[in-house]
């Protein structure tokens, strides 16, 4: 049976941790907190939160090792290992893309990744 996008998002949300916008801003007080905006570049350019890095959902898995806080940019595996236990928050427009992306990063082995519930619309 085929699944709708809404079903995929609901399934992802059952496996991940979501946080409120207030919890995100509290977490951002820690300079080691990573905020990744998974919206498309034109959405990011229109409005973005300070310190957010734009890795659209379609390329997140291939680019996360390039995050500025990764200390091993030349070695993908070492960069991923460096980032895997860092607090990572994902945000999008409404919370759907960030939920799916959070689920994917958890499957990659990231341990402290969370999705911002409701995204920018919250």
Region annotations inferred by a language model:
Residues 62-68:
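Short, charged, surface-exposed secondary-structure boundary motifs
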Residues 53-60:
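Thiol-based oxidoreductase modules, predominantly thioredoxin-like and allied folds used
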Residues 1-50:
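Flexible, polar/low-complexity N-terminal or interdomain linker segments that lie immediately upstream
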């Amino acid at each position: 049976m085929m699944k709708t996008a809404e079903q995929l998002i609901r399934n992802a949300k059952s496996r991940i941790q979501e946080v409120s916008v207030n919890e995100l801003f509290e977490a951002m007080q820690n300079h080691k907190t990573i905020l990744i905006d998974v919206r498309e570049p034109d959405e990011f350019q229109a409005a973005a939160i300070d310190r957010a890095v734009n890795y659209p959902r379609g390329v997140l898995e291939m680019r996360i090792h390039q995050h500025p806080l990764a200390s091993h940019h030349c070695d993908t595996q070492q960069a991923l290992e460096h980032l895997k236990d860092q607090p990572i928050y994902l945000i999008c427009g409404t919370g759907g893309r960030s939920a799916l992306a959070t689920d994917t990063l958890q499957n990659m082995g990231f341990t402290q990744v969370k999705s911002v519930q409701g995204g920018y619309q919250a």
